[in-house]
């Protein structure tokens, strides 16, 4: 009996030992894992969920919301595309898609600056930063060229011209970024993450040139006789101006701010990530949404004036007559009545001559030397003056000469 009890006590003392080992291992893993992240998360993605470094979560949320809004705008533009009837508003649709694609790339690139660096991530950062900004600035420059033509001439370039200009301008930055990676990584066999901040900024000089040209071009969109397109030019001006301010701030912070606050490279990635998210939202709010809204508006229809509406001011009769060029039936009726009057006089003369011939023949006299005259017409063919003829003749009706009986035939 005592042996059985002793064996049970030994088994109860053995079972807690593995459980304690498991708890100790879990505690050690929790100590090494950041707060807010799971146990199986790779170390390079810790900044996406680390509650101790809250900047990563905030920038991640802002970039994710911007990406969703951009996708929604692309979907709306794609669905409403068949209903766009205005030719001038339909031409830049492809350019809008290209701009939204570049903006979506900026929001996606933000995540590459939140996670930890490795060779692949650094190559993506160095290549896509300049290329995506070049795409957005090229689309803005093409849009500024289009609005300038609309403001001055009322017509815009063709769709393929706008897209071709944007792609050709972006291709220059693609070549620059490719050469930078090839010369530093492949030829010199340096790590992709081993680059100085000044080298990163120098590789973006072409983007700065595009931004400056776009800002200057947008100023000319406010000068022209077609005023309804100046709103588009004003939004382009605001977008480029805010983008220029963002670039001045991030380059100052990236090149000089970290050394002044003695943080080393600790704030380099947050600075670049915040720049991408802020630039993307500026593009969405101040350019993409207004342009898509203006593109989807119904075409303007000029309604004819309601002449029975007493609330409208009266139009001048002289101006209305001069603008409409109404046909004047009065002159035509007057000419017609004058012809009728002449025909009546000729009939009266013919009737008098015929009466004289009859009287001379009854008296045995020879007819006069005036020749034969037509006889008097029947009463059914006698001229009957109209009301218009009476009005034009001053209210008097021409009468025929009296016959030999003394009565008028009319």
From Swiss-Prot:
GO terms for cellular component: cell surface; cytoplasmic vesicle membrane; membrane raft; plasma membrane. Residues 78-94, 148-164, 221-234, 293-410 are cytoplasmic. InterPro entries: GPCR_3_C, RA-inducible_GPCR3. Residues 1-28 form the signal peptide. GO terms for biological process: cell volume homeostasis; glucose homeostasis; locomotory behavior; positive regulation of canonical NF-kappaB signal transduction; positive regulation of canonical Wnt signaling pathway; positive regulation of inflammatory response; positive regulation of macrophage cytokine production; positive regulation of neuron differentiation. It is a multi-pass membrane protein. Its main location: membrane. The keyword Transport does not apply. Keywords: Cell membrane, Cytoplasmic vesicle, G-protein coupled receptor, Glycoprotein, Membrane, Phosphoprotein, Receptor, Signal, Transducer, Transmembrane, Transmembrane helix. This is G-protein coupled receptor family C group 5 member B.
